[in-house]
Amino acid sequence: MQTLTRVLPPLRLIMFCQSGENPAQFPDTGGLCVEDCVRLRTPEGLLDRLRRWPGAMVISAGRPSTQLLLWQQVFLRYPRTVVFCSSNAFLPVDVSVEGYFRHLRLIKRAMSVRVLARMAELAIWSSLQTSPYEEEMKSALSVPELVMEINSRTLVRLLSERLPKQGRRVLGLLLSGCSPEMTARMLGTGVRQVWLAEQTLKQRWDIPTGVPLSDAVRIRIPDVGPDISQQSGLVKTGAGNAPDLC
């Protein structure tokens, strides 16, 4: 089955699975027309391969919010790269990352080969027809600016939904960085009431049981060195190593 042969030349495909991620999150790629395929595990190896394989498509195992700084580097250097992040589950912050980077898409591991092939076709054509300038500018933000932008998008999107009054107040405080204990004090209620409001919101957005709501909707600025332009490490969320998502 060669679903892309009529419209696109054979792909160069990079299967990227950073240490700590589960390669079982990769989707079935048997229906893609692939000229070359390589599996990589380090950010340095990925960036070097993209240098040698311009126009290659990347399928990455794991959620994009846990690798935010890596994708920032990828789109800064190679703004037309198409990246698919594959996982069994995604959090609200991941949706915000997808909305920020034009050529990054979220896919579920169980996605059919036909749907994946069609998505790849559309994404690659889109990357070829759009100017790389916008992606370069978005990727040139400092780390704090990038994290603040992603968190702001999450805040606006989630608070625009029709939420119960208590849930909206709890969410707003948690997104502002308040702990559950501080949130309870500011609302004049008990920690259990805050916890119950959290559970309601987690069910609404399919957030796994073991992942705190604050970690699912907010990225923390990582501890990086002064030369952040060279930083390609991970932006940590508390859910980054949650077994529920692997």
Where is each model-derived feature located?
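N-terminal regulatory/sensing modules of transcriptional regulators
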Residues: 1-142
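Basic, Lys/Arg-enriched C-terminal extension of HTH/homeodomain DNA-binding domains
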Residues: 196-246
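Helix-turn-helix DNA-binding segment
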Residues: 144-196
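Generic anion/oxyanion-binding catalytic loop in active/binding sites
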Residues: 35, 105, 159, 172, ...
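Residue-level recognition of oxygen-bearing side chains
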Residues: 45, 179, 212
